[in-house]
Amino acid sequence: MKYMVLFSGLLFSNVLVASELPDFLDMNDIENAKFQCLGESPQYSAQDQKYIDILWEETLTYLRAYAEALTNDQNSGCLNSDIAMVDSTEGGQHMCVMDRRDMKLMVKNVYQVINNADAAKKCFGAREDVSWIYSPGGELESRSEVAQWINRTTFKQFFDKQVTDKEVQQYGKSFTENFYKMVTGSEIKMPAVFPHDISANALPNLWASAGWFPMYAEESERNDKNFNNIRGGYAYAEIFGHWGLLRIDEINGEKVGAEIGMTVQAVNSLYPFHNHAVSEMYYNMRTPACANQFRTMAIREDSPLIRTVKEDSKVRRVQFDEGQHNSQTMWLSGSNAQDSLTYFHQNTIHAFDIDGQCEASPEERAIVSVWARSNAHDTRNDYGTTLLCESAKHPGTPAKRGEVIQCDLTKVKW
């Protein structure tokens, strides 16, 4: 059940437009919300402000559609909630995603922003001065006046100058050259719970200008446990959150933990088994080229399939056997139309196996997702660290399918 409120700031009009507010939210928390920015409020000249306005309007459109999707209960069997896959083992486990308090708080934060857009806008900027986020360049940038104005360092420049591994460079070159085709086209389609399209097909300035980070490309000890095709074929962008365009520290005196953005992973790749101390979710927005193309494995930290091999006051080291008989049943297939929403509780071990053999032009295709983390404000849990698992037999090397896998799980503090 929902009731009606009014809000401004939609892309297509300055007129107040009716919006449905989920009934688990308190109107008093939404109306006239007070925002404290993370860092200084960005300042722009009148000439530059026109580009910020375009980017802001597309950001509001993205956030509003995301919140509406999460609270869409038309076909979920839930109340004010979409349904999410949370564990792929033992036939798969699901839950009403809005049963989680962290998700309720994130949706509240989004409605506080879109219903007080003018007040929240003071915390919004292009982050054109940040050196570690990049533009995909190419056709995506050439079609966006905002991205051209920001003029970020491009993926091409990044892979040429900052990536030293030659194989990763080659994967990065292909990723860069095909990025526009990966995020646009008819196979990019929103799940049915979304009220409208928020892909690069509909919001070209946001997708070109958000600021992308190929987070695994550079050399690091962590990437010894990664695959080169992921290092050169994966990137994410954040539009709302500590590292994003909209950086809010507090709303009404309460810390904001939401991080909302998008991810792109090239096909023919296995995003390695990993975990983190912060809950995370994905909405798949790709129509698959064949059945079982997009496979996810998610195993919760208290699963009977996991055994503890070592622990101290901060970390629990665990193992599980991905090579056991019928291990393929630990994976579930998804798409924009089947199990489109996945939610990973803190310390859920997960991986994404993306097949490309059924694609006519696999170099031009990727899985594209709406992405979010919900409680990133609690720094006690080292929210920014994604911990890659490793081979139990060969520690320090990537964990492959078909073997015993070893992971370090953070002892989460509440």
Swiss-Prot record:
It is an enzyme of class 4 (lyase). One of its GO terms (cellular component) is periplasmic space. InterPro entries: RmlC-like_jellyroll. Keywords: Lyase, Periplasm, Signal. It catalyses: S,S-dimethyl-beta-propiothetin = acrylate + dimethyl sulfide + H(+). Its EC number is 4.4.1.3. Catalyzes the cleavage of dimethylsulfoniopropionate (DMSP) into dimethyl sulfide (DMS) and acrylate. This is Dimethylsulfoniopropionate lyase DddY. It comes from Shewanella woodyi (strain ATCC 51908 / MS32). The gene is dddY.
